[in-house]
Amino acid sequence: MNDDSQDKIIHDIRIQLRKAATELSRWKLYGSSKWAAEALAGLAEAIDVDQTHSLADESPLRNKQGVPKQMFEIPQNGFGLSETEYDLYLLGSTLFDAKEFDRCVFFLKDVTNPYLKFLKLYSKFLSWDKKSQESMENILTTGKFTDEMYRANKDGDGSGNEDINQSGHQRANLKMVSNEHESQSNISSILKEINTFLESYEIKIDDDEADLGLALLYYLRGVILKQEKNISKAMSSFLKSLSCYSFNWSCWLELMDCLQKVDDALLLNNYLYQNFQFKFSENLGSQRTIEFNIMIKFFKLKVFEELNGQLEDYFEDLEFLLQVFPNFTFLKAYNATISYNNLDYVTAESRFDDIVKQDPYRLNDLETYSNILYVMQKNSKLAYLAQFVSQIDRFRPETCCIIANYYSARQEHEKSIMYFRRALTLDKKTTNAWTLMGHEFVELSNSHAAIECYRRAVDICPRDFKAWFGLGQAYALLDMHLYSLYYFQKACTLKPWDRRIWQVLGECYSKTGNKVEAIKCYKRSIKASQTVDQNTSIYYRLAQLYEELEDLQECKKFMMKCVDVEELLEGIVTDETVKARLWLAIFEIKAGNYQLAYDYAMGVSSGTSQEIEEARMLARECRRHM
């Protein structure tokens, strides 16, 4: 076979392999696509074909009718990839799809195109993340590292057999692989490489030429900076990325994770509407303007959901998005979650029912649906949901959380904890799983384990109200009320209009001896109450505190409010109203108001036998003086 014939065959094979790698990946046959890309990378070089010319310099003859129809052209994607770079992209992309991240990094080690550089460094980051997650799986299972694991990490062999003979050449090879592996696992080296590349690349281009490749690198830099707790620089990188390319929803979510309190969100919102600008290269038409860019509107809604803002500030954006996206399941799930956060469980359940009918195989947000069914004690419906999602995908974090809620509803807390651990093994950032697992440990009276779970939750998401609230409750169970007070205060900054948090803050202040602050908290709780029946116990507690402060007139006022609530609720009696009637009867007897005292005593128709007997005794005493 002469050289011309061989080159022609190689050229045809190259075209066919490119076509196979691209089309098989498009139709999700990742194994076959990876094989074709590997074969393409291992193909011999064609002598008469210049493989380094740019796509912009493609010969117009490619579009002539004489070219066979089966000829596969490299897509004119505007990424500026040469033929060699495109072949590398196919190989790296298929290896990435097959989750062979280290191999992807190896084959892309010398790339200079920003898109390929992102693919390489993103693979490197995911490889590091995968290894760190695998090390955490052991903690979730056993709670500690064993000596065998330490030896395996140290010596590379967990079997304990230290008599394996290796040649010097083998040791050298192992050392080389180990050093390269260690370098790939070092997150700081990834950040350094990104910074070096961005510094050199930004010099070469004008500000308006920033493209998607640059946006992706800024995004990855932000993710790594956030991982290293450098929040301010991470936010700066995310904003640069969004300025170049605004439709990266993951970048918006990462930016939101940088917000720890409501004030941060307000400052960011002001910055977005006053100083932020979109670049023209990747943002089209109306989406270049802050006013009409839908991603900013989605971001504002997500921030409202996470930081429990006032609905009036976001209602206009929500109405606009619902008009533009009337069938977007994400928005419907958002609406349902808002109802859940506002404790409107009936509306939330109805909205989730509609979502399940519209998109029955969507598992996102269904763990919130299971929380609603759990709180409403609809155990049969929760059991059906758990069975349904397990048939769709048993190995999704959402599925594990739903099954865990089902076992918790059946009081099988050990099984519930097991499924929450599975959810965390599948996705270690599932904050909800950490928080709910903490609740399960509280049910088992294991406060120390609960505290550890809640701490993990707030480490991942400092905006998690339930985790801060859970920490306060766990320390309250241990009678460590100053610690409890601190964590309840943190929770209060996230939900200042929640009645429950002011009530527990009042209890904490009361137990630490600060009665004045306790009274203030209880009064704030009353203002935040939505219905009258929620206030009975608070009125009685306020009356007790005023009695301890020897302010009997204020005490009497709140005792009377307790009784008034009973009348407003059409005679529904609580323990507090019974005690309030007895206290008022004694108070009026001391004041000489026997008729009024008699009425209070006769109003005690239920309660403990001791309370009923005391009421009869007071009534008899009143009759003797009347």
Swiss-Prot record:
Pathway: Protein modification; protein ubiquitination. SMART domains: TPR. It is found in: Nucleus; Chromosome, Centromere, Kinetochore. The APC/C is composed of at least 13 subunits that stay tightly associated throughout the cell cycle: APC1, APC2, APC4, APC5, APC9, APC11, CDC16, CDC23, CDC26, CDC27, DOC1, MND2 and SWM1. CDC23 interacts directly with SWM1 and binds the destruction box (D-box) of the substrate cyclin CLB2. This is Anaphase-promoting complex subunit CDC23. Present with 80 molecules/cell in log phase SD medium. InterPro entries: APC8, TPR-like_helical_dom_sf, TPR_rpt. Phosphorylated by CDC28, which is required for the early mitotic activity of the APC/C in its CDC20-bound form. The lineage of its organism: Eukaryota, Fungi, Dikarya, Ascomycota, Saccharomycotina. GO terms for biological process: anaphase-promoting complex-dependent catabolic process; cell division; positive regulation of mitotic metaphase/anaphase transition; protein ubiquitination; regulation of meiotic cell cycle; regulation of mitotic cell cycle. Changing residue 123 to N: In CDC23-6; G2/M cell cycle arrest at 36 degrees Celsius. The keyword Lipid metabolism does not apply. The modification Phosphoserine is found at residue 59. One of its GO terms (cellular component) is anaphase-promoting complex. It comes from Saccharomyces cerevisiae (strain ATCC 204508 / S288c).
